[in-house]
Amino acid sequence: MLNPTEIRPILKQWVAKAMPHEETDVFIEELCFIDKARRADLVHANGKLTAFEIKSHADTLSRWEGQQEAYMACFDEVWLCCHSKHLVKALESCLPHVGVLVVDDYSGMAMIRKAKPNKFQDKFHLTGFLWRNELDALANQHGVQTKSRDLIKEVRRQLSDALPISEIRSHVLACLKLRYR
């Protein structure tokens, strides 16, 4: 039975074949989000931010509902990659636009349901991927007035209130691709 660490390279291989993957695109393992309260098992940053939650045979789906809600606040696409033992419950518990992949004990992987674009992203949570200097750069680029003494959460709120999600998303993608290159 494969554990999440063994599933991750199989998943990366599948993603590289099934999705556009250019030289400048990156895979990010264990990316923290929602104020470091959550962690995505794998994120693919290409023209969008795609997150994957891995549930191995040894895991349960007991935390998936809360995890799914958090993923929806931050990522363009969300996928659940689960062991075949979890498939029925996964299909019942996943929102209709969450993609579902199944992995077996022999390193096989199959797409059960394709992910659809997520329309529930939250601008404030999206800014949580950015470091302070990246937040300041985004503010300067768009003329959003901030002060160096402002708390990071205050700057994030100002940017969320002032900018469209497309501008925030583009900056987050560029920063993450640069940071994890």
Language-model features: locations:
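Catalytic cores of nucleic-acid endonucleases
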Residues: D59-L101
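Active-site metal-binding core of divalent-cation-utilizing nuclease and nuclease-like domains
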Residues: L2-T50
